[in-house]
């Protein structure tokens, strides 16, 4: 399991060896304080605070102050979980976090210098009452059990005497949860600082999830902010997810947002830009409208509810301009044309993915792919997304095999196999036409997978898009899906270790393929002349 120290090293390595200008990461919003952890970074407990499971204990200043017994215990805890880092099977995130949390509690007990304590106090003051609210939920989770296993979530709230008593009786635990947030903030800030000092134009690109867990800290402490209990958020059916998706998240209450001047949204965006040079908005359509799904209806039974996109885009552009940053809106799938027009008018980038980019936006699998030279300029262009298998896997129909295995297909497997075959052939035709592969390679895909993956990345370089992205999974030749939309426990979503085609875990950059590095380098060369202008 990686940590913020690994992130820092990845950023500086990408900057120094590939001249990369940014690195897009999954959301690092807050998760549960103890196991069981929610594997999906897109279903956080709070979007205001950070995921502390990625803290690197050794990088905390007070780590050096551990006494001999405490240091020995920390090293023992680390030794117990270290072998898992060489295993390409499913990551045991619960065990990894349990061991790390014990180590962090020991570091927390080390006395801080006056300067460090002052910095901690300043952090708490700047974070405001929401920090103690999140800490209270975290302590309640530990003392009263997971909220889905008991009644405390429904029977208590921020004004309950039981909650006040809990915070008094367990003030040390509340302080520990606040401290974890401070340490996470420090380490992500250090990663972003290192990225910029290494020459990255943007550094970290953080990802903003659509919403939060229905039983998480944000909903418990401030239920009035959400449409709680009767609806969840998702998306309607499309070609890639025939059943639609229900993300299980309560939507923001648009009336509350308007009445309170979008304060909660402002705080969230401001916090993300304090550690990043760019922010990607997952499902940017959510700024305009969200697919509300009535309880028990399934994704097909939903309907769109509109939001004041002008207010939220204004907040995004103002906060981005404070750090000379960028905003990327994930506008894939079912998105009205006016959404892309509005984004471009304000200098917000959209997303273009080679696997989705067809001539005239045709939905038919066998229709020709667009020439990347015709892609939008104001966009982040990539070969694939985290909702598809890595490109090597996609070329070998891993998406069809996995969906059949998980009973996610809505018709005969032969029908979907034929569609995937037509889709692949259309991509091969585009690559042959672009003179990036030969007809002989196109006729013998299985023996030339990596050559085709390289060709697809080289084709991306012909795009005029201001940001170009290569996925790390493609860089090392991984084939397994990191995430299968529409599933939860059925698949090991977000727990698949990074491995090469031989399923050996990747620890160094030695396996990163030249085309992935070239995408980063070519993007660096063009960035100064193509920087979009953010318009608040």
List PLM regions with ranges.
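Acidic/aromatic-lined carbohydrate-recognition and catalytic surfaces
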Residues: 1-222
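Hydrophobic faces of well-ordered beta-strands that scaffold small-molecule active sites
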Residues: 21-25, 202-206, 279, 327-329, ...
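Active-site-proximal helices and loops of the catalytic beta/alpha 8
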Residues: 40-42, 50, 66, 192-196, ...
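A structural motif corresponding to the C-terminal end of an alpha-helix
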Residues: 13-19, 187-202, 271-278, 315-326, ...
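Conserved alpha/beta catalytic core and glycan-binding cleft of carbohydrate-active enzymes
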Residues: 116-119, 331-479
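Substrate-binding/active-site clefts of carbohydrate-active enzymes
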Residues: 132, 201-264, 268-271, 275, ...
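Low-complexity, glycine/alanine/valine/leucine- and proline-rich hydrophobic stretches
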Residues: 474-508
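Short, solvent-exposed loop/turn segments at secondary-structure junctions
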Residues: 28-33, 142-144, 209-213, 285-288, ...
